[in-house]
């Protein structure tokens, strides 16, 4: 049975992220780990790439979770990569059509249904995260030199 027929029968597509298989579930707006279904990656937590056709996020390979860069990150994570995956139309054009009440074939001319995809991985040293961490380290040093800034920055 071909992939499109399987999809129309309800079999969800999968994507490989750093060697981990994830089920694409656009109804729930998430990628669900095939081996550990409680490990989910929410599409809402991902950033749209500049081209508007992909999502970007930092992925912790060990914990199988999205890694959020924040102002308190002062060390570079050891088991993480920058991940790029297609947007919803690239991941599951049939699922997108169903989400909006359209026919299953609606998006297929521009977005053919394909075999499970594989995420593009970029090492952290080429991701911009090291520079972000260095900037956070500098801010931390400034805060340590002026204790009032720590109180001001941490207050709600």
Predicted regions and their residues:
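A positional "C-terminalness" feature that preferentially activates on distal terminal regions of long
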Residues: 95, 103-128
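Short, flexible domain-boundary/linker segments around small modular repeats
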Residues: 1-17, 31, 37-67, 85
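Eukaryotic compositionally biased low-complexity/IDR segments
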Residues: 88, 116-132, 140-149
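OB-fold/S1-family single-stranded nucleic acid-binding modules
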Residues: 72-73
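Non-Sec secretion/translocation targeting segments of pathogen effectors
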Residues: 24, 133, 148-156
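Extracellular/lumenal glycan-associated surfaces
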Residues: 16-34, 56-63, 69, 79, ...
